[in-house]
Amino acid sequence: MEKLYADIIINISHEALDKVFAYKVPFSMIKDIRVGQQVVVPFGRSNKEQTGYVVNLSRTVDYDESKVKEILRIETDHVGVESNMIELAAWIRENYGSTMIQALKTVLPVQEKVARKARKYIELCIEKVHGPAMLDEYFSKHYVAKARLLAALLDHGKISWEMASKDLKISKSTVDSMEREGILHVVTEYYYRNPGEFSIAKAEAHVLNEQQQELIDEFREDFLREDHKTYLLHGITGSGKTEVYLAAIEEVIKQGKQAIVLIPEIALTYQTVTRFTKRFGERVSILNSRLSKGERYDQWLRAQRGDVDVIIGPRSALFVPFSNLGLIVIDEEHEGSYKSEQTPKYHAREVEIKKAQMEGASVILGSATPSVESYKHALDGTYRLWELTKRAKEAVLPQVYIEDLREELKAGNRSMFSRRLKELIKDRLNKGEQIMLFLNRRGYAGFVSCRSCGHVMECPHCDISMTYHRDGRLRCHYCGYEQPMLKVCPECGSPYIGTFGLGTQKVEAALYKEFPQAKVLRMDMDTTKRKNSHEQILSAFSDGEADILVGTQMIVKGHDFANVTLVGVLAADLSLHANDYRAGERTFQLLTQAAGRAGRGDKPGEVVIQTYSPEHYSIQTAAKQDYHAFYKEEISYRSLMRYPPEWQMLVVFASGEDKAWLDKVMDAMANVVKHMDLMVIGPSEAGFGKINDQYRKVIYIKNKDYETLVKAKNRLEQWIDLNKIRKNLLVNFDFNPMNSY
């Protein structure tokens, strides 16, 4: 028998071990070993047992065979990595900066096998005509238990083990004896754990409107001739994007293919999964972080075995092991949750496009408010642009009012509700219609503003709001500029200047005070900690158990409530002035999504946006649901300030206990890349300069070309390894970050 060798990535995340190690495959394992399996090997001088993943098999090695150690065993209770996922992991490692083992664990959403759920049944083996004679024999020999079990089997043909043991009081020895006699046999049936109670009553497909049908006709044509594109579906809120997804998936399933649907938040699960199960029945599966280990493993197994056609879930669902992948849909593609905050800091949108290219699949990116990056790709022809400009069912867009909170203060209204919003809430409560109040807290990080004139303290060098720190100073987290906190507004001289603080609990309390008869539900991180709490809150609101739903951004993501006719955005400025170059984009997206919740049924809707910055283009364009006008303003700003997508950005983040050493290393790293024709900003202190006694600093590197930044990352990694920097410091890389540091 020929020798076989395995290249193995050791399961230790350390840069010094980020390479393959060759091991000999024992003859006894040659038939069983596979690429992707987890194995146990002797590692290091002490030959300590260590796990690793097989990434390649070959007949030869490049060095002395006598020094090559043998694999000890294959880990049968661990899930292996599919071979195509190893290639994807290598791409992630190269493009985002991580070790190979970190990348492998990323593409393996389920790592441990979990015992299958099983039910035992007892089935009759003999023909029923012989049953009475056998019963007589058992009675004559006083085999009472056997007679009782046989009588039940003659009546039912098959009974559960539970019924036999609990109801009939039959022992295992009795069953074993009758099985040996050939009277019956025991059958074990495995079943999947059910992660949630979702409706699976199938419903007929909706009739598509003219715009939707045109898109599906184009998709079908492209798909049948294996022209697999990336489509950007830009549709105004309520335009029926989900119906386009469903119809496209139906086309894919007809061709024997499978589909992955990514959703941005667990809060979308209840309504989204119900819509998909109504269309495709039980062949829909769900993956999310709230599943138990067993539920998660079962859904992974269903996908691997081809028992499902559609899998729905957040970012990690991208890596399910479908064998015939035909389509990946990413709904609300602009959402920040698609970017991993853990190393490797990959973006699901970019990885799914790479995965689709590898597996011959199509991609649909959908949003009412596409990311600036995606829309730029659509305009330059990298993606195919699809647009839905009409609301489905001929529903009209809501009337939007922008309320200037500076004027409210002048009029003596110090309440968190503007006068118009109060009147409209009263009106809806009287009519028995529902209200959603949205607190735009996303990205909130202690910006300082004036309540009299709306002025926000911004960095004079970066055009980004500065953050207030406990030492009484304002800092810019991009360039490090700082200044003392002011006691009066530099624009109007008002003493009403300070940080902006507002929470959902305060809103709930204020509602009960203003409208004691109203029934209020609150949806935020505190009220959604328990499993299925999202679904329970949304279901209760949908069923009319409350008049008002108060929440953070999780309440505005794609939920349809026919009786909601009023949406209030209480403080648009909370995200608008976050110290982040994406603040304007995020504000536009959240306001547009929030406004889109009103008037989705037969009744017209109204939206109130409360702000200290009514003139800002993000607020003006969101009120009109005019994405094109917003994009024109935003891309000009990005180009002027050299932010993505006009320029590419790499963040080098480092932290450590020794501040002097951190400063020295970060200065040295900035010098390493400065001669590479790059724009290097910093090093500067991170937003939180110290956490858990770890000092934190960042360097921002910019260039028009992404590959040039990848080369800069590689150069820095080499320098870090050469100087053994990671012994004392944590260093991470983040391309085009979604959040500020």
Report residues per predicted region:
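Short coil/turn motifs at beta-sheet boundaries
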Residues: M1, A16, E82, H142, ...
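Accessory, non-ATPase domains that flank or precede helicase/AAA+ motor cores in DNA-metabolism machines
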Residues: M1-P314, L318-S367, L379-A395, A668, ...
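Short, flexible, solvent-exposed loop/turn segments with mixed acidic/basic and small polar residues
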Residues: N11, A151, S639-P644, A686-N692
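Hydrophobic/aromatic-rich, well-ordered segments within soluble, folded domains that form packed cores
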Residues: V39, L88-W91, M649-L650, A654, ...
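A general secondary-structure junction signal
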Residues: N56-S58, L108, T188-Y190, L439-R441, ...
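Inter-lobe coupling/hinge segments of SF2-like helicase ATPases
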Residues: K202-N209, Q213, E226-D663, A670-N671, ...
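A carboxyl-terminal module marker
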Residues: N671, H675-Y695, V731-M738
